[in-house]
A protein has these predicted regions:
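Mobile active-site "lid"/loop adjacent to the S-adenosyl-L-methionine
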Residues: 117-132
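Short beta-strand element of Class I
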Residues: 71-74
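Class I SAM-dependent methyltransferase "Motif I" SAM/SAH-binding loop
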Residues: 54-56
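S-adenosyl-L-methionine
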Residues: 1-49, 59-66, 87-115
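Conserved short alpha-helix immediately C-terminal to the canonical SAM/SAH-binding motif I
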Residues: 82
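Conserved SAM/SAH-binding beta-strand->alpha-helix loop
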Residues: 79
Length: 132
């Protein structure tokens, strides 16, 4: 992907209502607005929440969200140009039970309260285990 394309995607990311790009300082200072309130303040329902860590382009997150409309899905990844694809596709398809968060995975304990998440998936770990 060319750098112009990447810059354009970063700009577009700022317009997506289903893509949250929290400020690292706010996360560290425990000022993240959705912590403990994802169900009511973001999804507006009490359905279970499933996280996919390292979601990349969000294909798996999107597939599951379409397959299970009574479950809320959140894909997390640090790469803005990748997560752009999932957020854009969800908007184009009108999928309401999915969100994407662009942040480092090691910060997730500051994004969610204890018991707020029902399942966590790491579908395609990177780096993958290498056997010698």
């Amino acid at each position: 992907m060319g750098s112009k394309n990447k810059i354009q995607r970063f700009k577009e990311n700022k317009t997506f209502i289903n893509l949250i790009q929290p400020n690292r300082e706010k996360i560290i200072k425990k000022q993240f607005e959705f912590k403990g309130n994802w169900s009511l303040n973001y999804f507006k329902n009490n359905n279970p929440i499933v996280l996919e860590l390292g979601c990349g382009k969000g294909e798996y997150t999107l597939y599951l969200s379409e397959l299970n409309p009574k479950i809320n899905y959140i894909g997390i990844d640090i790469k803005g140009a990748r997560i752009w694809r999932g957020a854009k596709t969800a908007i184009e398809k009108g999928i309401k039970n999915v969100a994407f968060v662009r942040t480092q995975i090691e910060l997730i304990s500051s994004l969610f309260s204890n018991g707020e998440i029902d399942e966590i998936w790491i579908t395609f770990p990177d780096p993958q285990i290498k056997y010698k």
